[in-house]
């Protein structure tokens, strides 16, 4: 919206991604899709010690129950002690997101903040997480990968299930994982 009316946004990913002087912990980029249009969005998480006994869970633009489920899966399947931590989650641009294909990016941002380590530069995520910690393919995975490649990302982390037939554009490494237990290694490129 401008002073002279509405203007179309040719590249919504531009307004949903921030640019920082140096990498920061707690920030991950997710490849999402709204209908047929893929876009990238910055996920921000802050994990800190619970100061008042009962940990806080606060989200802006995301279902709080789903975040609770993702945190429980992290605790059970990765061994992260989330019951002692306050967790705050936000999407850049004030977006409200219901896409389960962003689960992997949300968990990536939480892991990054928990360990206070930035995600490696040029990394993007797309995948749904199940209760057993498995990483499932996000709908329209191929379009999400293409959007990440188009915007210059060097690596995208996706589900290893059913991605053998997905076209892999030049210039982007497609890293497949089957469980969130594999995610920290892929995020920090260890």
Regions found by a protein language model. Give the residues of each.
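Peripheral, non-AAA+ core regions of ATP-driven protein-machinery
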Residues: 1-30, 37-190
């Amino acid at each position: 919206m401008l002073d002279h009316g509405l203007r179309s946004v040719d590249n919504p990913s531009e307004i949903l991604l921030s640019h920082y002087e140096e990498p920061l912990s707690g920030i991950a980029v997710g490849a999402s899709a709204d209908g047929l249009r893929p876009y990238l969005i910055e996920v921000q998480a802050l994990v800190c010690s619970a100061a008042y006994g009962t940990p806080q869970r606060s989200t802006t633009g995301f279902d709080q129950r789903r975040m609770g489920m993702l945190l429980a899966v992290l605790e059970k399947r990765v061994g992260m002690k989330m019951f002692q931590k306050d967790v705050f989650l936000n999407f850049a641009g004030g977006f409200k997101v219901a896409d389960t294909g962003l689960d992997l990016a949300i968990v990536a941002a939480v892991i990054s903040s928990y360990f206070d380590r930035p995600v490696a530069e040029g990394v993007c995520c797309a995948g749904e997480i199940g209760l057993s910690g498995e990483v499932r393919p996000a709908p329209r995975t191929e379009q999400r990968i293409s959007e990440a490649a188009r915007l210059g990302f060097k690596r995208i982390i996706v589900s290893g299930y059913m991605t053998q037939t997905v076209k892999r554009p030049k210039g982007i490494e497609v890293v497949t994982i089957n469980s969130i237990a594999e995610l920290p290694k892929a995020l920090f490129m260890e």
